[in-house]
From Swiss-Prot:
Catalytic activity: Hydrolysis of Ala-|-Gly bond in repressor LexA
Biological role: Represses a number of genes involved in the response to DNA damage (SOS response), including recA and lexA. In the presence of single-stranded DNA, RecA interacts with LexA causing an autocatalytic cleavage which disrupts the DNA-binding part of LexA, leading to derepression of the SOS regulon and eventually DNA repair.
Species name: Novosphingobium aromaticivorans (strain ATCC 700278 / DSM 12444 / CCUG 56034 / CIP 105152 / NBRC 16084 / F199)
PANTHER family: LEXA REPRESSOR, LEXA REPRESSOR-RELATED
Quaternary structure annotation from Swiss-Prot or TrEMBL: Homodimer.
Gene3D superfamilies for this protein: Umud Fragment, subunit A (2.10.109.10), Winged helix-like DNA-binding domain superfamily/Winged helix DNA-binding domain (1.10.10.10)
Biased composition (Low complexity): 91-100
Protein name, UniProt field: LexA repressor
Chain's gene name: lexA
Chain positions of site Cleavage: A120, G121
Keywords: Autocatalytic cleavage, DNA damage, DNA repair, DNA replication, DNA-binding, Hydrolase, Repressor, SOS response, Transcription, Transcription regulation
First-level EC class: hydrolase
DNA-binding region: 26-46
Length: 234
């Protein structure tokens, strides 16, 4: 049996993994659970790991795997994602849940449109191209997808590196804390964490060397959210 906070954290991690394939950062977990410090997150993670609900993947930053779900929990609260939605500024539309797709055969390959480069640093223009990228269908869920090549290092703490291919599910809505492709002022595209703050849109990097970027809601259009990553080793 888990405590309320342990159950909330486990649910939050599972939801983020299902949505983006990437574990949430300790900062995101701290904010989602309304904790005062990251040490509280560390204690919850350790407790879940000791009880066999999650495990940390070796040699990978921010890599958590959910092993099982609890049968019951103490003081079960509303899922964190619901609390986030309740606190979301209405300047941008809320997330619409996408249907779950049936698992694709492991040997199926889909040719995704490769729309040039996207910045993981200062925004750069998203280049259109007729190129495609072969992607295992098992990496993709429901919906329409496209690929962008990552340029820059501002998302390295999220495990996204220069030269990676971002696999993006087309959508114009997203929750706070999700990694999105944001079109800024109709000209530049960037890959960042999305947050809404005091009537503004904040695009957060995952690199302490970069500062958050603030824009008016009408200056930012969500064009997709991160569904996965593809990395080539040469």
């Amino acid at each position: 049996m888990l405590t309320r906070k342990q159950h909330e954290l486990l649910t939050f991690i599972q939801t983020r993994l299902e949505d983006s394939g990437i574990s949430p950062s300790f900062e995101e977990m701290k904010e989602a659970l309304d904790l005062k410090s990251k040490s509280g997150v560390h204690r919850l993670i350790s407790a879940l790991e000791e009880r066999g609900f999650i495990r940390r993947l070796p040699n990978r930053a921010r890599a958590l795997e959910v092993l099982r779900q609890p049968d019951s929990a103490v003081g079960k609260a509303a899922p964190v994602s619901q609390r986030e939605a309740a606190n979301t500024n209405s300047a941008l539309p809320p997330l619409r849940a996408a249907p779950k797709a049936a698992p694709a055969p492991a040997n199926d390959v889909i040719e995704l449109p490769l729309h040039g480069k996207i910045a993981a640093g200062v925004p750069i223009e998203a280049l259109e191209t007729t190129a495609t990228l072969p992607v295992p269908a098992a990496l993709l869920g429901a919906g329409e997808h496209y690929a962008l090549e990552v340029s820059g290092d501002s998302m390295v703490e999220a495990g996204i590196f220069d030269g990676d291919y971002a696999l993006v599910r087309k959508t114009d809505v997203a929750r706070d804390g999700e990694i999105v492709v944001a079109l800024v002022r109709g000209e530049e595209a960037t890959l960042k964490y999305l947050h809404r703050e005091k009537g503004m849109v904040r695009l957060d990097p995952a690199n302490a060397a970069y500062d958050p970027q603030y824009y008016r809601p009408e200056e930012v259009a969500v064009q997709g959210k991160l569904a996965g990553l593809l990395r080539r080793y040469h």
